[in-house]
Amino acid sequence: MTEAIKTDVLIVGAGPCGLFAVFELGLLDIKVHLVDILDKVGGQCAELYPEKPIYDIPGIPMITGHGLTESLMEQIKPFNPTIHLNEMIESVEKIGDPEFRVITNAGTVFECKVLVVAAGGGSFQPKRPPVPGVEAYEGKSVHYAVRKMEEFRGKDIVIVGGGDSALDWTLNLNPICKSMTLVHRRDDFRGAPHSVEQMRQLVASGKLDLKIGQITELQGDNGQLSGATIKLNDNSVAQIKCDAMLPFFGLTMKLGPVANWGLQLENNLIPVDTGTFETNVPGIFAIGDINTYPGKLKLILSGFHEGALMAQKAVKYVYPDKRVVFQYTTSSTNLQKKLGVN
């Protein structure tokens, strides 16, 4: 067997919650490795909405998913975590009290005192629209996420869906595209009321073509769209020109190997103690979207709070004989020295 990498804590998931947990653990002199199945840090922020504005991070009126990821990476620099990308945890074995041996699909072996599951909703993939042949255009002119807004400048865009993502990208991309069509199966939208109002203003001003119906056929060649056929709710048919399509039908979440780790599960989520965010297995914690408890809000800021409380319990496993005194970064010269600001 490959020689094990020994670390205090192994975090599964390098999204915002996992990254901020590095910061909280680092303040307590805890060494951390992270593993993520994606090829980049940032989790859903980086993979699904790197340029989408986020408005509910405390003290930051607006930041993109990419911007938040960069800021978190800058914040954890003093603690020099080791990040393993393109790897998925395949097995977890308890070898101590507590101590775990963790093996990835790449054969990397870890031995850690604490395991933190910060894997969002598990592995996720966009739901494919029920349009024949759509897979031939995926990645070329059919996109399930906007990674660079500039790629859509001057294009004829069709956006499909009626939720927040569809409305948000309708509003954000409308100023830079050549033309835009929004297609939804009914004239009733699930997004924020303010976004719905702004969308209808674009329709009224002639800047957005709203079609109530469903796309039934795509036209194009070699992965490049040229048009789409829409069956409208009045049974008529509309033909539109488009060279890019953005379907927002939500995500299919799969818990993946986490389901085989001996953790208690509730509707594919992990119940936790809200004082420590520890699972039913001592030494294994769950923070972020993957956990559940009464009153749970799936917000980034909630995951930050969970990471802070998790660290206060994790340190007792890492340093069982050490008396830990709670300190504030604003006044502790010790913490400021760790952060390189003193």
From Swiss-Prot:
InterPro entries: FAD/NAD-bd_sf, FAD/NAD-binding_dom, Fd--NADP_Rdtase_type_2, Ferredoxin-NADP_redctase_2. FAD binds at C17, D36, Q44, Y49, I89, F124, D289, T330. Binds 1 FAD per subunit. Its EC number is 1.18.1.2. GO terms for molecular function: ferredoxin-NADP+ reductase activity; flavin adenine dinucleotide binding; NADP binding. Its cofactor is FAD. It holds the Pfam family Pyr_redox_2. It comes from the Bacteria. Belongs to the ferredoxin--NADP reductase type 2 family. This is Ferredoxin--NADP reductase. It comes from Rhodopseudomonas palustris (strain BisB5).
